[in-house]
A protein has these predicted regions:
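NAD(P)+-binding Rossmann beta1-loop-alpha1 motif at the extreme N-terminus of oxidoreductases
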Residues: 1-55
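Rossmann-fold dinucleotide-binding core
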Residues: 112-189
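NAD(P)-dependent Rossmann-like dehydrogenase/reductase catalytic/cofactor-binding core
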Residues: 225, 232-316
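Rossmann-like NAD(P)(H) cofactor-binding subdomain of soluble oxidoreductases
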Residues: 55-140
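Residues at the C-termini of beta-strands that transition into short coil/loop
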Residues: 30-32, 67-68, 105, 127, ...
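Active-site-proximal catalytic alpha-helix in oxidoreductases
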Residues: 181-211, 219-232
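Helix-loop-beta segment of a Rossmann-like dinucleotide-binding subdomain
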Residues: 138-151, 201-213, 269-280
Length: 316
């Protein structure tokens, strides 16, 4: 399968590594300014969760291939920061690069807006479960064994089976939620609840330390669960039926103090979950999650005292 990845970011490159190892041709679409100094290869440290529940540490090399203009790919993965999705699609259009788009990112927009971004491209919505950071020519990442994928009926692309075959070949499983747009909103609301608690105590300068402080305190985690409940009310006010997402939301239904203790134990025991929490350190993205949910909550008149108090303490 021919795959293009937009940019050389952490998430796109982590999946690119998995696909390349499975024998697929993977190329990165880079801006002109980045093309000339793109590294030929990256050293990779990966906590790989595909084969063991605790994950395996892998040390490897990833070969970087840069995409040329006017080419056609089976799939083009776009894992970009909020606000840049439209721009990302424009870059592809400008370079006359064709293929089915896989949107692989957080957004607080409606399906109609996503369709406008895609324009004449076929597209499907998915959501990665990977994270990490990139420094110079080194990728330090975490990869879980599954990702979220829009169902075949809703996606309406002709090569859906090719995509699931690609995932299977890289030993990745997928889950199909009721509706991918709503699922992403819920995911953002949960993120906003957690990070607003973690970050309220100070600047987002050091997200890694904030995450560690949160994971080590069951009382902070209990408070995070209360903040998540408020954030979910915002999603509900947008017209989402939360009953359709029972499995995802189960942990936030039990009493907060019990859930807080359970979460603390889970973080202590599961290095995969712990590591992804500390590696999610994109300050802009964290702030965008909190800000989007909070502003919509205000517009829709949702009562959210905890979120409100937290947002006052957050600055980038």
């Amino acid at each position: 399968v021919r795959i293009a990845i937009l940019g050389l970011g952490v998430i796109g490159t982590t999946y690119a590594y998995a696909f390349q190892k499975a024998g697929h041709q993977v190329e990165h679409v880079l801006r002109d300014s980045k093309r000339n100094n793109a590294p030929k290869s990256l050293s990779v440290d990966l906590l790989d969760g595909r084969y063991h529940s605790k994950g395996e540490n892998k040390h490897d090399t990833y070969e970087v291939h840069v995409a040329e203009a006017h080419l056609e790919y089976d799939f083009i993965f776009l894992s970009v920061r909020h606000g840049f999705v439209k721009e990302a699609v424009e870059t592809l259009r400008k370079n006359n690069i064709k293929g089915t788009l896989v949107f692989f990112c957080n957004f607080w927009n409606t399906r109609k807006e996503v369709q406008e971004w895609a324009g004449d491209y076929d597209y499907i919505l998915a959501f990665p479960t990977a994270g990490g950071h990139m420094q110079e020519d080194h990728l330090d990442g975490v990869l879980f064994d599954h990702l979220m994928l829009e169902g075949e009926q809703k996606a309406d692309i002709s090569n859906y089976a090719d995509l699931t075959d690609l995932l299977t070949s890289a030993d990745l499983k997928w889950e199909v939620p009721h509706d991918m747009v709503e699922w992403i909103w819920i995911h953002m609301a949960i993120n906003a609840g957690v990070t607003s608690i973690a970050a309220r105590s100070g600047k987002l300068e050091n997200p890694e330390q904030l995450a560690l402080n949160l994971m080590n305190s069951s009382s902070e985690l209990s408070l995070a669960i209360k903040a998540i409940r408020e954030a979910l009310k915002v999603v509900e006010a947008r017209g989402v039926n939360l009953k359709l997402y029972k499995a995802e939301l189960l942990p936030y239904k039990i009493p907060a103090w019990i859930a807080g203790k359970a979460m603390k134990i889970m973080f202590a025991k599961n290095e995969l979950t712990r590591k992804i929490m500390t590696l999610h350190n994109d300050k802009q993205d964290i702030f965008y999650c909190c800000q989007s949910v909070y502003q919509t909550g205000q517009e829709l008149g949702v009562d959210m005292p905890i979120l409100e108090a937290n947002m006052k303490g957050i600055s980038i």
